[in-house]
Amino acid sequence: MSKALRASGYLDYMLQAIDRIGRYTAGHDEAAFMQSEMAQDAVVRNIEIIGEAAHDILKDAPAFAARHTEIPWKILYGMRNKISHGYHVVDLAVVWQTAVESVPELAPKVQNALKVALLEENPPQR
């Protein structure tokens, strides 16, 4: 992401990645996921995207992030760093658990934050 976006842009990236993770894991169980390098790579990549977008919000819209503590911005970025910089030691069981438990819990929080961001960035005309 080369150009700084508004918070809504980063949140939209996060939602797209969340949706992709849901599609890539749908119909799979953990055993099938462990056998599919393509699914593993796709999920890992989208976790990285979520984490990078979270970092960009912390950097470019810190006040917004501070108002939305329901989203674990730093934890998301930390997971991205572990995956990106420790690719040879990625624990796929943790990736699976994150994809099927944590990511679905994150989705409504990001959706709500996006609604707020859009209202703040585009206030209604009076």
Identify the function of each model-found stretch.
Residues 1-126:
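Solvent-exposed interaction patches of small proteins and small membrane subunits
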